[in-house]
């Protein structure tokens, strides 16, 4: 029983913390390694999924840089862990769908499988999500003035929430 406790304590103290630290270090160091590798002219002989992975990582970093330049007030509001998770998904999908042996590569060229098509569609969709321009999520709702008069409005905050955010707080007011 003491061995089980030892491994449980080892995992809690060392393994999970070092695993998390390694994932963070890999996420921080990956874009610089990819951009240094992109200047290498021998990149054309790599498989297409690895090439797409490096393009997606660079495009994802540029997306956050572009957002911070457009809106300097919200330069610290992007979610680093979301960026890290998407990078890891692209990396894992790229390596999972890459054919390593030459015999399988020749066979895959002759007979396209539906799994390969799904892999290409997933990677293309992720890459498109990373490279598309960010869209505004604010919705302009029309503010109806004149329906309610000032003496009938008891809560100005509730009216503001109802008009701007589309939240109805309280009973309906009859006109």
From Swiss-Prot:
Q: Which UniProt keywords apply?
A: Cytoplasm, Periplasm, Signal
Could you tell me where this protein is found in the cell? Cytoplasm, Cytosol; Periplasm
Q: Does the keyword Signal apply?
A: yes
Task: Name any GO cellular component annotation.
Answer: cytosol
Any one Gene Ontology molecular-function term assigned to this protein's record? translation regulator activity
The signal peptide here is 1-38
Where does the UniProt entry say this protein principally localizes? cytoplasm
The similarity comment for this entry is:
Belongs to the SecM family.
Could you tell me what this protein does? Regulates secA expression by translational coupling of the secM secA operon. Translational pausing at a specific Pro residue 5 residues before the end of the protein may allow disruption of a mRNA repressor helix that normally suppresses secA translation initiation.
Task: Report the protein name in the record.
Answer: Secretion monitor
